[in-house]
Amino acid sequence: MTTPTNRPRTWILPPLPFAAAILGGWWLDRHRWALPLGDGDRLAWLGWLLVAVALLLFAWSLLTLRRHGTTVNPYRGAAALCTDGPFAFSRNPIYLADGFVLSGASLILASAWPLVFAPAVWTAVRYGVIRHEEAHLEATFGEAYRCYRQRVRRWL
């Protein structure tokens, strides 16, 4: 059973700030104040490419977590420290994928609004989620996590 002492004390569900930035940006762009981002037709293909890369990275991350018998759920404790697959080059490949979706959606929508919200999104994820996950991982895996943190960057 997962108790508050053996799981991260995450404040928010990580995809929510990303989704809010995309949906809020779309709504503002269409209903209040357009903030166009170049020629939508020319940039949309790049946006779809970013979303495709994000989906592949997300799937690879999920498969790696599953292979190690641990969870993607930010409200549950980690059962294993994943240091291979996408976790060999990023400590947060799922949030990196979320960032690719945010950027891709901005290009697909041809709206700069999601990118305007990006600093607030990254701040919310950094302090509302990652800080708590990292504290949990260090408390759970100790020196193994500290070595991993020294070896692998947070993003890329």
What do these predicted regions represent?
Residues 92:
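Extended, alpha-helix-rich binding/interface surfaces that flank or overlap catalytic cores
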Residues 87:
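Solvent-exposed interhelical
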Residues 1-84, 96-156:
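Membrane-anchoring alpha-helices and their flanking helix-loop junctions
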